[in-house]
Amino acid sequence: DNFPHLAVTKAGVARIEDRPPLIYHFDTEATKDYKIHAHSAFANYRGSLLPERRALIESYMLSDIAFKVVGVGSVGTFCAIGLFMTADGEPLFLQVKQALPSVLEKIAAPPPGLSHQGCRVIDGQRAMQAASDIFLGFTEDQKTDRHFYVRQLKNRRLGSIGEVIEGKALDAYASLCGRTLARAHARSGDPALLAGYMGKSEVLDDALASFAMAYAAQTKHDHAQLKAANDTKAGLARK
């Protein structure tokens, strides 16, 4: 979980190994000053943790930081990973991701006390998750006035299980995902209000199924276009 394969030692200093184009350092003219901002941002991040977790993170020092390419939901935002080390050489990777304003702010003002976008994100995660990341926190870059949330870098995901799961078990897996999502929303909202909105008919069920099918069709269409563009580019490169 601590990604030891990403940590290398150079001249006695632990650094993140470049894995371009997915992981790379701030070496260009446009990004050279981000590391200085990152040290300040991570210092502010510690203050967002609960006291007992703050004491734990204090045993780590920021050793290196690098850009990390993540999922499509974060395209166009600042995403990086920080390598923290203890005095005896134990690594900890934290991920810092830019938090943008909620789309709901276009129609309604944010609740009092939630003007910090990173704080808003982690409050939602803590409400929806039965057990959240112990290092989940938030910070900001005061020079650019951008907000971020911070969490541990994870390499254990269940999303890819759908690619290898047996057909007979897929229905049970989908049901488990649905129950988990429903439980999360019930934790973060009013269960009675949600139940009343959904009703007892199959209208919502049909709407969700229709959305899922349309989303799958759009994904296939987008992938076909991406593959065609990639094949065209590869053909031009060979010429």
Model features per residue range: what roles?
Residues 1-31:
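Internal, well-ordered alpha/beta segment that forms a basic, Gly-enriched binding/recognition surface
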Residues 1, 43-239:
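Conserved ATP-binding subdomain of kinase catalytic cores across diverse folds
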Residues 33-39, 43, 47:
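ATP-dependent kinase catalytic cores of phosphoinositide-metabolizing enzymes
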Residues 24-34, 116, 166-167:
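General structural signal for secondary-structure boundaries
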